[in-house]
Amino acid sequence: MTDLKITLIRSVAHRLPEQRKVVKALGLGKINSTVVQPDNAATRGALMKIAHLISVEEVNK
């Protein structure tokens, strides 16, 4: 089973409200903040909405 390491690399300033909500829901705050989330369809869907703001790596448990 793999997890996803998600890092916010661009600011959410001047972004759409929906994109800001997705960033907050994933647990990201400031630039360079990193979280580990499970690799599932819901997480992947959220990441697609903010793909231009983040970097994603797969990590093994």
Curated annotation (Swiss-Prot):
It comes from the Bacteria. Keywords: Ribonucleoprotein, Ribosomal protein. Transmembrane segments: none annotated. One of its GO terms (cellular component) is cytosolic large ribosomal subunit. GO terms for molecular function: structural constituent of ribosome. InterPro entries: Ribo_uL30_ferredoxin-like_sf (IPR036919), Ribosomal_uL30_bac-type (IPR005996), Ribosomal_uL30_ferredoxin-like (IPR016082). It holds the Pfam family Ribosomal_L30. GO terms for biological process: translation. The keyword Acyltransferase does not apply. SUPFAM superfamilies: Ribosomal protein L30p/L7e (SSF55129). Belongs to the universal ribosomal protein uL30 family. Part of the 50S ribosomal subunit. HAMAP family: Ribosomal_uL30_B (MF_01371_B). This is Large ribosomal subunit protein uL30. It comes from Lactobacillus delbrueckii subsp. bulgaricus (strain ATCC 11842 / DSM 20081 / BCRC 10696 / JCM 1002 / NBRC 13953 / NCIMB 11778 / NCTC 12712 / WDCM 00102 / Lb 14).
